[in-house]
Amino acid sequence: MNIWVIADDRTGNTHQAIALAAQLTGKYTTITLEYNFLAKLPNFLLQYYPIHIKRELLQDIIDKLPPDMIITAGRRTAVLAFYLKKKFENIKLVQIMQPNLPYNIFDAIILPYHDYRDLLYCGPAKILSKNIKSHCKVLNYSSRQHDIEKMMKIIPINGALNNITAKFSAASLELQKHYPHLKQFTAVIIGGNNKRFSFNEDIAILFSSLLNKIYSNQAIPFFISFSRRTPQIVKSIIKNNTHASTMIYDPSKDTDYNNPYIDMLANAKYIISTADSISMCSEAASSGKPLYIFYPPNFNSLKHKIFIEQLVEQKIARIFNESITMLEEYSYKPLNEAKKVAEIIKFALKINKS
């Protein structure tokens, strides 16, 4: 099967599309879009013609042999998929996240529960997976018939699609090369500010105190990875208030070691993650390692809360707060939404991995 992944400057979206493509086929082609100043226009204007894509690039895409399937993530790439579907009628379209276009254009639409609350009450893609057992309560839509057609193309997922575990073997070797004497550690994955959360000094002080409480009871060194979103003051507070044995990766500093994030997830005994990134928490939840999520008092993002509450209910994650004095080993079925979605799509569209 010939699959195109339509990528753009939204790295997180692209990673999700690639994760799904890798589960569907051994070979896929990534086409990276370049936008012009019209990319900010709403999709109801762009749907008639993808004027937001640079003309030479669009022509080059049109001139290629059409694929069997196109995977897109996010609204701007969805517009190109819609346009190509009109030109090449037989291609299948799989969209990740809301396309802001009519659902009947697509063969499957993958939506996270946290972005679309109705999914909490629906069975996964009733047509796409009609012989696959539903894993959530089915809502009675008798009074909402207009929703039925929409819901039938939807495959709901927890969090963000990823293929992080496929990289674990190489990651283990890389970590051993740089830290040959490191036997065990707790990975501490720290994000930063987002639209609905400010990682401020008070939160950094609270987080540091929680880490110190753990270390005083359980002397396993921390390996901290900061994000590019982590405020400098937060980095300083955490660096100055954690035990001397703590290893720290700061992407703003020069280093001969590329971001060890994947290496840390692959080799950690425990994982502590901040709650501000759904992608980050999804990847940690895919590792199979005991996962503790720091969920500070000023954290106000509803979609993040919905996702984290699901992880806790499924006994994948635990909340990292003042009640935690030691990290415990426990097991769970790792999150693997890319594989689940790929199986549903292969069954529904009658395709084989080739």
From Swiss-Prot:
InterPro entries: Elm1-like. It comes from the Bacteria. This is Uncharacterized protein RP120. It comes from Rickettsia prowazekii (strain Madrid E). The lineage of its organism: Bacteria, Pseudomonadati, Pseudomonadota, Alphaproteobacteria, Rickettsiales.
